[in-house]
Amino acid sequence: CTAMFGSTGTGLAATSYLSEDSDMLGAEAAYAALEADLQHELDNYESLHPGYDEYRFDLDEIKHDPYVLTSILSALHNGVFTLGEVQGDLAMLFEKQYILTQTIETETRYRTETRTDSEGNTYTVEVPYTYYICNVKLENFDLSHLPIYILTEEQMGFYAAYMQTLGNRPDLFPNGSYPHASTPKEPTYYEIPPEALKDEAFAAMIAEAEKYVGYPYVWGGSSPSTSFDC
C-alpha cells in the first residue's frame, strides 16, 4: 500500500505513529470513558429507565482495540493528530461502533382479585392488565469493521500500514493495561510440497500470494493498497 513504499526512512515514518504520546493515550482514554458511560447506563438501566414490568437484555461486550482506534485517527489526520482535533471523530466512531436500541412490547395478562358481593360473600375474578416488557439490545459493530466505510482508499492504505507495524509502537498499549490491544504477529509460513509447484498455474498463484505475506487483516480490504480480509 502507499505507506509501505519509498525509501527506508520514508517507509518507516509512513508506518509509524507520529502523534505525541499524550494525544494518543488521551484519545484512547476519552474513548474508554465513553465506553464506561455506556456500561454504567447498562448496569443501571432499570433505575435510569423505570416504568416497565420486565427488562430483557441482549448485550454485546463493550471493547475495542486501542491500536485500531489510533490507526484510524492517524489515517484520518494525515499521520498526526491532537486530542483536541479528534473529539468529533471519537464521538462519530463511538456512535457507529455501538448501537443501543430499546423496544417495548406489551402483553395482556391476568391477575386474580378477590371481591365481596352485596351479601358479604367473597369471590375471585380474573382481571386483565397490560404487562410492559423493555427489550434492550446493544450491538458492538467492532471498531475494526469501520475503516472500510469511513476512510478513502488512500487512507485505508495508511491504516493497513499502521496496523501491520502497530505504528512501530508495540509498547504504547501494553496488554497488561489494555487487554484487547493487538500484539505483534509473525507471519505463518506453510511448506508447500515441491511436486505441487510443478503445476505452473498453482506456482504462479503462490508466487503472487507470497508478495502479501505479513499484510494485516483489514475487514473489507480487497486489494494490496487496502490490505485484505481473507
Where are each of the predicted segments found?
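Active-site nucleophilic cysteine motif
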Residues: S225-C230
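Short coil/turn segments at secondary-structure boundaries
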Residues: G220-P224
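Intrinsically disordered, low-complexity
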Residues: A3-P216
